[in-house]
Structure formats: structure tokens, C-alpha cells
Amino acid sequence: MKVIGISGQTGAGKTTFAKELEKTLSGLFSVIYIDVDSLGHEVLKDPITIEALTKTFGKDILTDNQIDRKKLGAKAFESSQNTELLNSIMHPRMVKIVENIISENSKRPKNKIIIIDAALLYKMNLVRLCDKVIYIKADPEIRVRRLMATRGWTEERARQRLFSQDKEPEGFKIIIPGKDSFSNFRRFLSFFKKDYNLLVFENNGTKEDFESIFQPMYFASIFLRYKI
């Protein structure tokens, strides 16, 4: 069994990459995809979590006695202090769920890949559970335009969220810059076969550039199959 963590900057294409990776690897492995953001949505429904959040941020974050994510976000991201308060309540609960999923699947590990899709992979210390990490980045102005186009955010909101997530991590890196399939195949092969634990993908290009990355990744990942 291998655990691959996917992290990245807001608007860089992290979740799109993670879902495409899931499809790419599913022909070779039994793939379990963990969307940590979605786990957070589930945790928000827990009565103990609701009580902790309302004590911290006030009852005006509720709508019909449930957490209103938009109202909570407005308060939680208005200052770094509030963001840390939110994280201190949410993260331990979310991490525990991820740990339980990995523990359960480790009982039958043959030909199994677990993908952890988490914007705060490092800050939540989920990276300690990962064998490999792929980090998706893009230039700030490109990310702002994407967030405004795909999520309908204002420019102010997009820029506010740009800097609320993990910074680019340090470690062994293989930079995947673009569309050269053979070059990318060699990079992915090095990532899967050798002791590199971090791959950084710069997603500054077009949708076609982005999609071109997965065919060489598929062929390179064949080598991973014989190691798990």
C-alpha cells in the first residue's frame, strides 16, 4: 500500500489534479480517494463541533441550527487569529478520520493506493502519513483569475484566500513544467522509482497542457505497481 498526498495553492488545480490522478491509477490499483475538505463539511454537522464553533465565533454563524459555511468563512478568514481558531477546532477531528481510513485499509494493503487531497496537508501534519507528495502550484495572478471564473469569487475574496493555505514545501523536487510527454515520463519515473518524496507541478498552462500530464504518469506508475 502507498499513500500519496496531493496539496497545493488555492486556484492552482489541486483537486482537479487529484481526481485525474485517481482515474489514472484506478486501472492499475485499488484506489481510495480521501477529500479532506469534504470531511470538513461532514465534521461541521457534528453537534460537538457545532457547539465548539458557536462558542468561539458566535451563534450568528448558524442557519436553522446548522453551521452556515459562508457565515463561518466570513468570520474565520477575516484574520489569521480567527483562521487558527477554526483550524484548532476542525483539524484534529478531520485528521482522526483520515487516520482511521488508512488504518482500516492497511489490513488488506495489496495493490492499494490511498490519495489524500488536502490543501493543508502540511499544516495538518497529514504529510507524516504519506509515502509521496505531489504539490500543485501556479502564478498568483493566474490563480486569482481562475478563482473568479470558476467559483464566482470577487477579486478581493480571491486574493484573501490566496495566502491562507500552506506555503510551498521544502524537499526533493521534480518540477513538471509543461507538455513534453517523454520528459514528463522520465520525471514521473524518477519520482516513483527513486527516493524523491516530493513532486512539484507548475500548472500555469492551458487545460490541454494540464491533461497531457496524465498519460506519461500512467506509464510511469506501472513501475510503482511492482513495489506495493
Q: Where do the model's predicted regions map?
A:
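P-loop (Walker A) phosphate-binding loop of NTP-binding proteins
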Residues: 9
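ATP-binding Walker
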Residues: 12
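ATP-dependent NMP and nucleoside kinases share a basic, alpha-helical "lid"
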Residues: 99-150
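Hydrophobic anchor at the beta1->P-loop junction of P-loop NTPases
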Residues: 6
